Design a protein with these regions (language model features):
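Hydrophobic alpha-helical segments
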Residues: 90, 94, 119, 147-154
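Histidine-centered, metal-coordinating catalytic motifs and their short helical/loop contexts
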Residues: 134-154
């Protein structure tokens, strides 16, 4: 759960769920007190479980928000802030129609949001027009600025 790589967290949760299912019969027969723990663990990690995150980006982004909620519930502010920044970049790539996992696309999305939250940037953001067309552009800019402050504080 402490991974800063959200796609790996999703697939690790998928593997955990399979392991829990495989162990369920033995636990039920031989370790009855642990059955509740098994159910609790499954309940916590099932919402963030995804076998192939790259296959469905809207679902992947939704699952990453579930990971973010878990971080916040546990008071893990730094991983939450890190994930939220990565999530915004991924969501922007997807919104711009750019393949999310290609690093050049992620750099374009991040450069755009950085430039648009920096007073008088010295460069023209690569996806400025696409970003400004988003209804939620002002909210994203505000959130990005706040996340920058959180990251710098931590």
């Amino acid at each position: 759960m402490d991974l800063a790589r959200p796609l790996e967290t999703l697939t690790a949760s998928e593997r955990l769920e399979k392991s829990l299912t495989a162990a369920a019969a033995d636990i039920k027969d031989y370790a009855i007190p642990f059955e509740q723990l098994l159910d609790f663990t499954r309940e916590k990690y099932q919402p963030i479980s995804l076998k192939k995150p790259e296959a469905d980006w809207p679902l992947t982004l939704s699952k990453q928000l579930a990971i973010l909620r878990l971080y916040l519930e546990r008071g893990q502010i730094l991983p939450a802030a890190t994930l939220m920044r990565e999530w915004i970049v991924s969501a922007l790539c997807w919104q711009f129609g750019l393949p999310v996992q290609i690093s050049e696309n992620r750099e374009k999305a991040e450069a755009t949001i950085n430039a648009l939250t920096t007073p008088n940037p010295s460069w023209e953001p690569p996806c400025k027009e696409e970003f400004l067309e988003l209804d939620c552009a002002p909210q994203i800019q505000n959130l990005w600025s706040q996340l920058r402050e959180v990251r710098n504080t931590l």
